[in-house]
Amino acid sequence: MTIEYLKKASLTSKSDASDVQETVRAILADIEAGGDQVALDYAAKFDRYEGSIILSPEEIEAACAKVPEKLKADIRFAHDNVRRFAETQKATLTDVELEVVPGVITGQKAIPVDAAGCYVPGGRYSHIASAIMTVTTAKVAGCKHIMACSPPRPGVGVAPAIVYAAHICGADTIMAIGGVQGVASMAFGLFGLPKAKILVGPGNQFVAEAKRMLFGRVGIDMIAGPTDSLILADRTADPHIVTTDLVSQAEHGYNSPVWLVTDDRALAEKVIEMIPSYIADLPEVNRDNAAAAWRDYAEVILCADREEMAATSDRYAPEHLTVMAEDLDWWLDRLSCYGSLFLGEESTVSYGDKAAGTNHVLPTSGAASYTGGLSVHKYMKIVTWQRGTREGYKPVAEATARIARLEGMEGHARAADVRLAKYFPDETFDLTANG
């Protein structure tokens, strides 16, 4: 059976993408040339904010005092889960040594980058969870200086809950600046801060483009597009839960794709029927986003069986992948292309987005086919080292000289020759290239 689209997207994120490169390139160039003052000018223009950029300890304390105790407890709960998961990830990175030949020791070390810049969105929604996800993971990795920047609200500043989350999760500096100017401030080391060695966190198309342009000068977690989600559901799935989860992810933005892949026509048709009323029940801003995302970007796909469903999912390589079907272990073993996987009706992407412990900074736009999401590993440099005895390196030197000459790299060969001549003056070696 060829897959059947019961609903097909009329747009794709690529067809919707506007050309922001010129704008971002100009802002980055202006800020790099003009420094702090130009960044302040852009903050006043775009954020309509003229307060302190670097929050003082007193400002942090005042902001934290505004956060209700129940919300503080929830943030601490989420932070603890993310921290413990990140610590478990870090434990998989062990320093190793191997004696490749007698007398030559090679090794691997994992070294955290010195300074991390965490972008925390604060526009339409105050992304408290993004502060938790990015700052906590950088702290566990061992970064010496962690910066968190977030767009301030005019006359208000950064949302107090974001300040509280960034503070308790380990941010050394909290900045009231967003957009390209926020990313640039961290990358260029403005306002007396160290230059970020890596930039992480979600953001709008301008933030994503700024990170893309800066990549190479600094590291980045990924180039993120609109968030996307796919649900795999069979006849056992509850259409109410499926519909609720699709709508919950569509509210991210007008161009956030959501996909339902199923082998049960009745389920698919029921979900299509239910979606409009579920969207209509949302608050206005959320409703407008979800309605546009469902209308323009959503798809409902009917497959013959679970193997075809799995193959379809892997082809889409979604950021978020939920399975509501029988035999969850089969799906866990079979599926291979996703940012984060949520198995069973009991799980939901919203848990991962906010508090379950896995990171919500994930690859979008099909990038899950070749990369994973934000983790401790993104903040770490995996470096290698070696040392050895003269005798141990002797066969390595001989092989190096011959390979280098065969490649035409005489300078490399001579670096081996000189050592053999110095350490073994009474021996003769055949170091010619016979290829």
From Swiss-Prot:
GO cellular component: cytosol
GO BP of this protein: L-histidine biosynthetic process
Taxonomic path: Bacteria, Pseudomonadati, Pseudomonadota, Alphaproteobacteria, Rhodobacterales
SUPFAM superfamilies for the chain: ALDH-like (SSF53720)
InterPro entries membership: Ald_DH/histidinol_DH, Histidinol_DH_CS, Histidinol_DH_monofunct, Hstdl_DH, Sulfopropanediol_dehydrog_HpsN
Active site residues per record: 319-320
Family annotation (CDD domains): Histidinol_dh
Function recorded in the entry: Catalyzes the NAD-dependent oxidation of (R)-2,3-dihydroxypropane-1-sulfonate to (R)-3-sulfolactate.
Protein name per its UniProtKB record: Sulfopropanediol 3-dehydrogenase
Binding, Zn(2+): 249, 252, 353, 412
Species of origin: Ruegeria pomeroyi (strain ATCC 700808 / DSM 15171 / DSS-3) (Silicibacter pomeroyi)
Record family assignment: Belongs to the histidinol dehydrogenase family. HpsN subfamily.
Gene, per the UniProt record: hpsN
One Pfam family linked to the record: Histidinol_dh
Gene3D superfamilies: 1.20.5.1300, Nitrogenase molybdenum iron protein domain (3.40.50.1980)
Keywords attached to this entry: Metal-binding, NAD, Oxidoreductase, Zinc
